[in-house]
């Protein structure tokens, strides 16, 4: 039987970058708190956690790319909130941010985790940022730790 690989939830020694959208900050600040909570619980020191604020979700992939290619981080976590309005803007932004974040990870060969809420309403976004549906920021940071460790095991 061949080898089986998995990542562990031990963040000791990992360096993590968080890219956070300032737009809808009343939501994204909760995502950031959740992400920091997960990192701390799993042993990532505060000194090894950097935060880059961007104006909106659309700017997340560019800054994530710069951080991912810097060689300073084991993973990049992307946090934002895109809430549907009455125009097609939601579809354009959600689609491009999703594709951009995925492309950054593939191009950099680094875990670049999608922690962007795409919601039909403010209520849905609030639920996913720490109330009924858990905290997507916490989940994304946890995924970053696991995949960063998995990537180390694969080399």
Swiss-Prot record:
GO terms for biological process: riboflavin biosynthetic process. The active site is at residue 89. Disulfide bonds: none annotated. The keyword Transferase applies. GO terms for cellular component: cytosol; riboflavin synthase complex. This is 6,7-dimethyl-8-ribityllumazine synthase. It comes from the Bacteria. Catalyzes the formation of 6,7-dimethyl-8-ribityllumazine by condensation of 5-amino-6-(D-ribitylamino)uracil with 3,4-dihydroxy-2-butanone 4-phosphate. This is the penultimate step in the biosynthesis of riboflavin. Belongs to the DMRL synthase family. It is an enzyme of class 2 (transferase). (2S)-2-hydroxy-3-oxobutyl phosphate binds at residues 86-87, 128. One of its GO terms (molecular function) is 6,7-dimethyl-8-ribityllumazine synthase activity. Its EC number is 2.5.1.78. 5-amino-6-(D-ribitylamino)uracil binds at residues 23, 57-59, 81-83, 114. Keywords: Riboflavin biosynthesis, Transferase. Pathway: Cofactor biosynthesis; riboflavin biosynthesis; riboflavin from 2-hydroxy-3-oxobutyl phosphate and 5-amino-6-(D-ribitylamino)uracil: step 1/2. It catalyses: (2S)-2-hydroxy-3-oxobutyl phosphate + 5-amino-6-(D-ribitylamino)uracil = 6,7-dimethyl-8-(1-D-ribityl)lumazine + phosphate + 2 H2O + H(+). Pfam families: DMRL_synthase (PF00885).
């Amino acid at each position: 039987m061949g080898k089986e690989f998995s990542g562990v939830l031990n963040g000791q020694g990992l360096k993590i970058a968080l890219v956070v959208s300032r737009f809808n900050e009343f939501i994204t600040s909760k995502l950031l708190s959740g992400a920091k909570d997960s990192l701390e619980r799993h042993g990532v020191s505060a000194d090894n956690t950097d935060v880059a604020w961007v104006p909106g979700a659309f700017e997340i992939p560019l800054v994530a790319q710069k951080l991912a290619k810097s060689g300073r981080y084991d993973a990049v976590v992307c946090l934002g909130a895109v809430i549907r309005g009455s125009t097609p803007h939601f579809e354009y932004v959600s689609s491009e941010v999703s594709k951009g974040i995925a492309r950054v990870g593939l191009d950099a060969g680094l875990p670049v985790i999608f922690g962007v809420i795409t919601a039909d309403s403010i209520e849905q976004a609030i639920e996913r940022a720490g109330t009924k549906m858990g905290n997507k920021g916490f989940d994304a940071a946890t995924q970053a730790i696991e995949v960063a460790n998995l990537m180390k095991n694969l080399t």
